Amino acid sequence: MAKLTVFTPTYNRRYILPKAYEALCRQTSRDFIWLIVDDGSDDGTGEMVQSWIEEARIPIQYHFQQNGGKMRAHNAGVSLCPTELFTCIDSDDYLVDDGVESILEEWESLKEKEHLAGIVAYRGRDPHHTMFGETFPCSGSASVSELYRKGFFGETTLVYRTDILSRYPFPVFEDEKFIPEAVAFDLIDRQYAMHIFTKVLTICEYRGDGLTRSVDKLRENNPKGWLLYYQQRIQDSSASVLRYKYVAHAVCFCWKLKRNPFGEIPASRAEIMAAFPGAFLLRLAGKL
């Protein structure tokens, strides 16, 4: 059985998926499966993937579901994953040619793994350069949130143990289709560290129809998910300017949902009241 699942959630990205497919066909190790969860595409994605399955160049598992958003697709992917390791490669990203081999060799080289949830590595603009020239601020192991607290500002490739991911599914709300990834990953960070691997594993190509280009719209349409994100961030932060920002954002989403901030936000009454001016400014700026 393969050791790694390369998971790609997709929705009407037929035009870009061939790049990810060709990159997987170039892998120096074939010890993986490509799991595609199609979140309701109507652009012929399914027919194209079926043709690749018939080519039999790489093992592909395809699952179609009604459109429910990336987080539901991710939960489905984890539930379908048959391998020890799981990495999510978005449809506008692709693995470097030795990505699978590097992941498996690095993981197998680790002697103590019980405290590890997986591997954190770089995303880059090419196989030799990170997105903005950034480097990890420490070595060995650390939680992902710890890396960012210590000054890391770049993009990461995350490889998780499937058994751990399955215990931390993304919460879903019936009338929403998005929730920040950190809602699940922050919970994992509370219990586990990640092995730090200083190699570019995925090449990132942001596109105009991707989620990262529509953050304001995502915030407007998914207030419950964003409120949960800020609630968790407040729980994990101490007194700081950053904590104040989290509280201000949480106040905004409470107003949006017509909820009482004092009953929803895990902060003192004084902190919440102090964040009201910041919340008003966020609303004036169109950030809810």
Give the ranges of each region predicted by the language model.
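Glycine-rich, basic loop-to-helix element that forms the pyrophosphate-binding segment
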Residues: 65-81
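Conserved nucleotide-sugar donor-binding catalytic segment
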Residues: 125, 131-213
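Short, well-formed alpha-helical segments that are part of the catalytic scaffolds
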Residues: 12-26
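Short beta-strand/loop segment that forms part of the nucleotide-sugar
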Residues: 32-40, 61-66, 90-91
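Catalytic core of nucleotide-sugar-dependent glycosyltransferases
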Residues: 202-207, 214-240
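Short aromatic/hydrophobic "clamp" motif used to bind/position activated sugar donors
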Residues: 86
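Conserved donor NDP-sugar-binding/catalytic core segment of glycosyltransferases
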Residues: 98-133
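A conserved acidic beta->alpha catalytic loop
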Residues: 23, 38-48, 90
